[in-house]
Regions:
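N-terminal cofactor/phosphate-binding cores enriched in small/glycine residues
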Residues: 31-33, 43-117
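Noncatalytic alpha-helical scaffolds and linker/capping helices
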Residues: 250-337, 341
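Short, Gly/Pro- and small/polar-rich lid/capping loops
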Residues: 2-36, 316-340
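Mobile "lid/hinge" segments at catalytic clefts and subdomain interfaces of large enzymes
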Residues: 155-262
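Glycine- and acidic-rich phosphate- and metal-coordinating loops
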Residues: 86-88, 107, 117-131, 199-201
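Flexible, glycine/charged-enriched surface loops at secondary-structure junctions
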Residues: 116-122, 157-159, 226-244, 275-276, ...
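Conserved small/polar residues in nucleotide/adenosyl-binding loops
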Residues: 360-369
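Conserved phosphate/anionic-ligand binding catalytic regions in large, soluble enzymes, centered on
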Residues: 40-42, 136-149, 153, 339-359
């Protein structure tokens, strides 16, 4: 006898499926069924690939940090490919190289669109629950991460979209299948907003510039369709963005410091010796610390960074020179030498300006080969 615990509509009042096509394959978004305590959640279905995407934010800003604490996690589960972990304990291992790189690919286009002044912890998680080799879980995860962040109440200037582009027999292919990727002369990932390209990652086999440009343009056309799809969902389910607490340097104070000490910073930084430059900046920062006792150590570090950045930028744009006096087309003095160490197979040192890098080379014995 079948037992009915209630219809889906009764159990999940806000459950809804949104559908579109992505590169000729069905793309579905399920919302309102899972992870109700997160700021936003969605199950992304691209072909038979399923990726659970969630975003959460801490209610209060983290103290003692001078950066936006964003954490992007792309998690691969072996069960998604029908496999069981091979370890003795049958547990999932640490993230692989592909998972780490995918987390970075998603992080890069999303991070700049968050408010720089926000200090609340934000965690975006993408969990691959089912894998279809022909439907990229990385792209599904990127779109899902963008979608849930846009729908959530977390301040963010998105959304973004992303696609992969291949080149098979001279033809541009969006989100190529597994077989197409094997013979493709181009492995390109593009992320963009509605107006601008924000991230490109590419590997290619001698692809000319015109072909690469056409591939990027084709990607952006498809991405615009994705963003329109996301915007329709946001218009229906989007939450009002919260007002976050600004923690850190008061910009009115910084502008006052900038107006008073700009010439001092220019004079201190006008040298090609980093040690001399750092020593000249110390008394200036001591004066600022005495004049503004309410500034924390983190605030003072930020003042120093922002002032130096402003001076370097103005020199580049207004005078065409760099901080060490070099022109835009000049490079630092280079030096290289080899044979520094007697008991290794190879060694050397490469120096550029005041930055030396040493290196060693060893050839392992045949008995130490990885089988």
């Amino acid at each position: 006898m079948a037992i009915e615990f209630g219809s889906r509509r009764e159990t999940f009042e806000n459950y809804k499926v949104y559908e579109t096509m992505l590169a000729g394959r069905p793309f579905k978004v399920e919302m309102g069924k899972m992870c109700g305590l997160s700021n936003a959640s969605a199950l992304i279905r691209y072909g038979e690939t399923c990726v659970m995407c969630n975003v959460v934010m801490s209610p209060k800003p983290r103290e003692g940090v001078d950066f936006f604490p964003l954490n992007v996690e792309y998690e691969e589960k072996l069960y998604a490919a029908g496999r069981i972990p091979g370890s003795f304990m049958r547990r999932e291992g640490r993230p692989g190289e592909r998972a780490i790189l995918t987390s970075r690919v998603v992080d890069r286009p999303m991070r700049p669109l968050f408010p720089k002044e926000m200090r609340n912890d934000v965690c975006i998680t993408m969990t691959v629950m089912s894998l279809d080799p022909d439907c990229s879980p990385e792209i599904a995860g990127m779109i899902g991460a963008s979608l849930v962040t846009a729908v959530s109440d977390i301040p963010w200037n998105g959304p973004i979209g992303g696609v992969q582009v291949g080149l098979v027999d001279g033809e541009i292919v969006l989100n190529p299948t597994q077989e197409q990727r094997k013979v493709s002369d181009l492995a390109l990932t593009v992320a963009a907003t509605m107006d601008k390209i924000v991230m490109i990652e590419a590997g290619a086999n001698e692809v000319d510039e015109d072909t690469m440009l056409n591939a990027i343009k084709a990607a952006h056309v498809e991405i615009k369709k994705i963003i329109e799809f996301i915007n329709r969902i946001v218009a229906e389910r989007g939450k009002p963005k919260i007002d976050f607490q600004v923690v850190g340097l008061d910009m009115d104070v910084f502008h006052a410091i900038q107006n008073k000490y700009l010439d001092d910073f220019k004079a201190a930084m006008d040298t090609d010796d980093k040690n001399v430059r750092d020593a000249a900046l110390l008394p200036i920062m001591d004066k600022i610390a005495e004049e503004y006792p309410d500034l924390t150590a983190a605030d003072l570090d930020l003042v120093s960074y922002k002032m130096q950045k402003f001076v370097v930028r103005r020199w580049l744009l207004d005078e065409g020179k760099r901080v060490d006096g070099r022109g835009i087309n000049e490079i630092r003095p280079l030096a290289a030498e080899v044979g520094l160490l007697p008991r290794v197979h190879g060694s050397g040192m490469f120096t550029r300006g005041q930055t030396p890098v040493s290196y060693t080379h060893l050839r392992a014995h045949e008995t130490e080969l990885h089988l």
